[in-house]
Amino acid sequence: MRGSVMFEYALEVHEEPGSVWLSCAEIPEMHAAGDTLEEALDGAIDAMETALSIYVDDRRLIPTGDAGEQESDAVLRLPALTAAKVGLWNTLLESGVSKAELARRLGVQRPQVDRLVDFLHHSKIENVERALQQLGRRILLSVEAA
């Protein structure tokens, strides 16, 4: 796919007696743990979304993940909404458009734009898509065999 971003992150599995924890070299702020690998993986999305929030708070670009290029113990694929929010956040930073300006273009209040890049808030993907369109971007979605 031309110019596509995968939003797949290579995870390292660390095992200790009675527990497992996960880390991600691309997003070092991400850590998930559990009694088993399955439990740790179950919490990995929440842990990743919390870690991505740190990038927004610090006004940093978010690495977009390309696990296919790396050796890894496990792979974390972002949900569609989370991936769209990463795309929106990175586009805002790269374009230099402020949240206030995006709010003006969308005809909404600034707090609504804040929520569009808040990984802990469940936005409607249509609203993220509309914001991306205002920035000259679009969402591409593909479905493939697991």
From Swiss-Prot:
Residue pairs linked by disulfide bridges in the UniProt entry: none
Gene Ontology terms for molecular function: DNA binding
Record's keyword annotation contains Mitochondrion: no
Keyword Transcription attached: yes
Alphabetic keyword roster: DNA-binding, Repressor, Stress response, Toxin-antitoxin system, Transcription, Transcription regulation
Highest taxon of source: Bacteria
Its biological purpose: Antitoxin component of a type II toxin-antitoxin (TA) system. Functions as an mRNA interferase antitoxin preventing effects of the HicA toxin.
Subunit comment: Probably forms a complex with the probable mRNA interferase HicA; when complexed with HicA inhibits the toxin activity.
The family this protein is said to belong to: Belongs to the HicB antitoxin family.
Name under which the protein is recorded: Antitoxin HicB
